[in-house]
């Protein structure tokens, strides 16, 4: 299978490079800049990402692997693409002067294509002016020996693309992986062609390869899984079940903090052991208001209950988790060709004393790929396209102390909010929507009487990966705006007229950053 190694020097856009390449049916992995070259020497090509560093900072550890890749290119002619800081590293290595700017350039700007190159073939014509996104503090003043300037900035004549066709080394000062760059994905596609990558990274191939890996490692032994009903958990369970069948034992723990009437809707043939521990969780949360303390109590209690249920199954050697690639990258564990199955090391908070090996069938898939895989397996759209739900459940959406009554109120609000949203055909246009119950009461009037009830906040955001988010529908000046305002008026009326104890509804307009998506 063809594969590209992406060396991450800290760019906020690195995952976008990987997503674009994956969408072109080519496998790629992201590695930290301190990775040993031996780990990545078998890849078909290398991309050096952008980053906040400067070649003048003397970051020997960061530049070390880049230098080894360039030396490897000299011996093998393996293709290299340097983006932003990656360009500066490459050009600096070959002796070009890299100028340290006093002011960072972060904007959409125009470049002019000056010469033909295989990296811009059928993407941009010579003499054409192209919109690109620049995000850099340093710039390359002169092309290194053996390199040709392919494009430069229209306004400031910054070297935008350089290429050494003989060595198959290409560099861009701009970011081809982001949307402001016109046809940037086609430039990346050209690089894949230069690297002779086969377009064979498909959902069918992923399923078959992962099934084979799981079978080979698990053998005839038992696997246990704590299932939540979320997208990642459900897809991981379905894929693992297809590999080992009834060797997989699924446990669903009702914490009392789930959505109203929440159940696990997996493939019909997958058995699930339901355990109701709602009274235990709620009793341990009594009097607790700090969100971190709530999370800790829920996590520890969950581990305790899961251990008890695992002992009932007995003789399990493997624990399955729905870890996905963004979890791995963001936690700093994207290093080396880690196997899909590895020794348990307290991922997810489960204690080492359980002595289980970890099965992570989705470890190298992004969220959008997980959804596609779930569809290929046969899971329903209701499972695949559901909104994210926090691990601690409604405990972090009931602000302040959590008790059975407040959870009940929030469950009622949540059900009305989500169902009404679906009736307005808005649910699939929103990345995440939920309600929050606030620990304050306000005065209201219903009929001829005074009320003193809770305030609930509604939140709906659009996002690509949850790293940033905008309040719906303000990032999208479309017909959805008018529909959404009508929806908000209607759903707030339904809530206050049907949920006892609530007399006021507010809407959260804050983007991320500065706020987080969840309130706690």
Swiss-Prot record:
Pathway: Purine metabolism; GMP biosynthesis; GMP from XMP (L-Gln route): step 1/1. One of its GO terms (cellular component) is cytosol. Residues 201-386 form the GMPS ATP-PPase domain. Keywords: ATP-binding, Glutamine amidotransferase, GMP biosynthesis, Ligase, Nucleotide-binding, Purine biosynthesis. Gene3D superfamilies: 3.30.300.10, 3.40.50.880, HUPs. It holds the Pfam family GATase. The active site is at 84 (nucleophile), 175, 177. The keyword Chloroplast does not apply. It comes from the Bacteria. ATP binds at residues 228-234. The keyword Nucleotide-binding applies. Disulfide bonds: none annotated. Residues 3-200 form the Glutamine amidotransferase type-1 domain. It catalyses: XMP + L-glutamine + ATP + H2O = GMP + L-glutamate + AMP + diphosphate + 2 H(+). Homodimer. HAMAP family: GMP_synthase (MF_00344). Catalyzes the synthesis of GMP from XMP. This is GMP synthase [glutamine-hydrolyzing]. It comes from Wolbachia sp. subsp. Brugia malayi (strain TRS).
């Amino acid at each position: 299978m063809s594969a590209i190694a992406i060396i991450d020097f800290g760019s906020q856009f690195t995952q976008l490079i990987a997503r674009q390449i994956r969408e072109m049916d080519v496998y790629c992995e992201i590695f930290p800049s301190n990775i040993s070259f031996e780990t990545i020497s078998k890849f078909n090509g290398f991309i050096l990402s952008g980053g906040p560093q400067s070649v003048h900072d003397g970051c020997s550890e960061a530049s070390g692997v880049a230098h080894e890749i360039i030396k490897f290119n000299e011996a093998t002619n393996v293709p290299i693409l340097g983006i932003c800081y990656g360009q500066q590293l490459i050009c600096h290595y070959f002796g070009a002067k890299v100028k340290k700017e006093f002011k960072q350039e972060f904007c959409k700007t125009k470049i002019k294509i000056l010469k033909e190159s295989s990296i811009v073939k059928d993407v941009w014509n010579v003499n054409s002016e192209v919109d690109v996104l620049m995000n850099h503090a340093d710039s390359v003043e002169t092309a290194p020996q053996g390199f040709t300037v392919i494009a430069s900035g229209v306004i400031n004549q910054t070297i935008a693309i350089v290429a050494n066709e003989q060595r198959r080394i290409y560099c861009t000062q701009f970011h081809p992986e982001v949307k402001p760059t016109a046809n940037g994905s086609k430039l990346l596609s050209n690089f894949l062609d230069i690297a002779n990558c086969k377009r064979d990274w498909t959902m069918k191939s992923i399923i078959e390869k992962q099934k084979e890996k799981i079978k080979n490692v698990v053998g005839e032994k038992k696997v246990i899984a704590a299932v939540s009903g979320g997208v990642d958990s459900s897809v991981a369970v379905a894929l693992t079940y297809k590999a080992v069948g009834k060797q997989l034992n699924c446990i669903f723990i009702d914490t009392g903090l789930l959505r109203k009437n929440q159940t696990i809707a997996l493939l019909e043939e997958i058995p699930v052991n339901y355990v109701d521990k709602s009274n235990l969780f709620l009793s341990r949360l009594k009097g607790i208001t700090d969100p971190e303390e709530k999370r800790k109590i829920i996590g520890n209690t969950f581990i305790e209950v899961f251990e008890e249920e695992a002992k009932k199954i007995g003789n399990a050697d493997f624990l399955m988790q729905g870890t996905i690639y963004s979890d791995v990258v963001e936690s700093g564990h994207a290093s080396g060709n880690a196997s899909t199955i590895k020794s348990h090391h307290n991922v997810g908070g489960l204690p080492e004393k359980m002595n289980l090996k970890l099965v992570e069938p989705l470890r190298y898939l992004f969220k959008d790929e997980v959804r596609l895989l779930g569809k290929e397996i046969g899971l329903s759209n209701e499972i695949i396209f559901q909104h994210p739900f926090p691990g601690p459940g409604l405990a972090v959406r009931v602000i302040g102390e959590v008790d059975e009554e407040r959870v009940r109120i929030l469950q009622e609000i949540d059900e009305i909010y989500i169902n009404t949203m679906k009736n307005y055909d808005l649910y699939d246009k929103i990345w995440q929507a939920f309600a929050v119950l606030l620990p304050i009461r306000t005065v209201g009037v219903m009929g001829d009487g005074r009320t003193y009830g809770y305030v609930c906040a509604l939140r709906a955001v659009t996002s690509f990966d949850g790293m940033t988010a905008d309040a719906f529908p303000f990032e999208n000046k479309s017909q959805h705006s008018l529909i959404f305002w009508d929806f908000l008026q209607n759903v707030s009326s339904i809530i206050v007229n049907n949920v006892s104890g609530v007399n006021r509804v507010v809407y959260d307009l804050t983007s991320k950053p500065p706020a987080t998506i969840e309130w706690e």
